[in-house]
Design a protein with these regions (language model features):
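Domain-level signal for soluble alpha/beta catalytic cores
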Residues: 1-257
Length: 257
């Protein structure tokens, strides 16, 4: 779209190839698993794209064009049939709170409201910083605020349960570290130059403790959890899989007890 001078992608072209492929293979995957597939889709948000393409100076038409484009990708990612259901669409804004577009909060909220103007799935925004979260509480169409907690424990200090209740929002908290470069550096300082898969992943007890702390704070407002984001850079699928498995086991153990 940008090659033609527009930041708004044609609706028929706004399809994530991964989602398309999963949709095509949904019947086979569902029958192999013995259950309906619950899909979570993550998409870089309009603010992140704007920072990469334009910078910090706001241009309303460009912001609205990018918001419309991401909305179309999100809408087309909502699948629902007997084999698959898109349970969550998460818009990822990792720079928000660190490197912001110099626009008034009402403009930013308007951009995000346009982005989240779709139905059929829980609508999340994923942030790496809690700075500026107050501005997002008024965003319509947004169901869940998602934060890094495992690698950035101070994030939950900035978000109270009463804030979420007042805005009728839910929260997702990351409870297992995924910042692999820092993990490797810490292990190296301890004399572990070539860590095993098991050494890369935090102990189940550590993950469970984080879950308990977050759940105690947010109660029924904490409707989602899992690892922090960023498994793409992990050294192997085996290590990433172990992290996911250990996180699930930690949560189930905490809920059981």
């Amino acid at each position: 779209a940008m090659e033609t001078g527009s930041f708004l992608v044609n609706e028929k072209s706004a399809v994530l190839p991964e989602v398309y492929l999963i949709g095509q293979e949904a019947k086979t995957l569902s029958e192999g698993l013995g259950r309906k597939i619950q899909l979570r889709v993550s998409i870089f948000g309009p603010l992140e794209h704007y920072l990469h393409e334009i910078g910090n100076t706001p241009y309303q038409d460009v912001l609205e064009g990018l918001a419309g484009t991401i909305q179309r990708f999100a809408k087309n990612s909502v699948l629902n049939n007997k084999y698959i259901e898109t349970a969550v669409v998460s818009i990822d804004e990792p720079s928000f709170g660190f490197n912001n577009i110099q626009a008034p909060s009402d403009v930013i909220c308007g951009v995000l409201e346009k982005t989240f103007d779709f139905k059929g799935a829980v609508r999340q925004i994923h942030l790496h910083s809690a700075a500026g979260v107050h501005d997002l509480l008024s965003v319509k169409n947004l169901d869940v605020l998602s934060f890094e907690y495992a690698a950035s424990p101070k994030n939950i200090d900035a978000v109270s349960k009463s804030m979420l209740e007042g805005a009728d929002k839910q929260i997702r908290v990351g409870i297992a570290r995924t910042d692999i470069d820092s993990i490797l550096a810490e292990l190296y300082e301890k004399g572990v130059g070539k860590p095993s898969v098991d050494q890369l992943v935090e102990p189940k007890e550590t993950i469970e403790k984080r879950y308990r702390v977050a759940k105690q704070k947010y109660g029924d407002r904490m409707t989602f959890t899992g690892p922090d984001c960023g498994l793409g850079g992990w050294p192997s699928q085996e290590s990433a899989q172990l992290l996911l498995e250990r996180t699930v086991k930690a949560v189930k153990l905490a809920q059981k007890n």
